[in-house]
Amino acid sequence: MAWLVKTEPGEYSFDDLVRDRRTVWDGVSNPQALKNLRSMSAGERVFVYHTGDERRVVGRAEVVRAGGAGKDVAVELKAVDRLVRPVPLADLKADRAFAESPLLRQGRLSVVPLSEAQERAIEARARNAA
């Protein structure tokens, strides 16, 4: 399974994760996002998405430690690598794989599950120039 997590780069960017190597991903309050965070398992792939003015997928991470149950759910992520070509939100909106995705339908959802097709679409767009 793969996931996409959103972050405001002015608060904590993918560069910060690369610098820190690992971080505890917490501060999630939306009930659906918390449910998604609880569903993450160690070893799963994670794409990091910058919100705000950037609005693009910028890097890859991996779940190191799952979040467990309870109210204060958090997972530990480690940086994997930066995408060669960041993938803008406009590219995702144009891809049919994302037509029903919570990423587009629930814009404020900060932790989003990705289907295999969506993961492949991000990887393909990250490799190919526009």
Role assignments for model-derived ranges:
Residues V58-V112, E116-A117:
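Aromatic- and Lys/Arg-enriched surface recognition patch
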Residues F47-V48, E62:
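Hydrophobic beta-strand signal
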Residues M1-A42, A126-A130:
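Compositionally biased, charged N-terminal/linker segments
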Residues V111-A130:
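Charged phosphate-binding loop/patch that engages nucleotide di/tri-phosphates or the phosphate backbone
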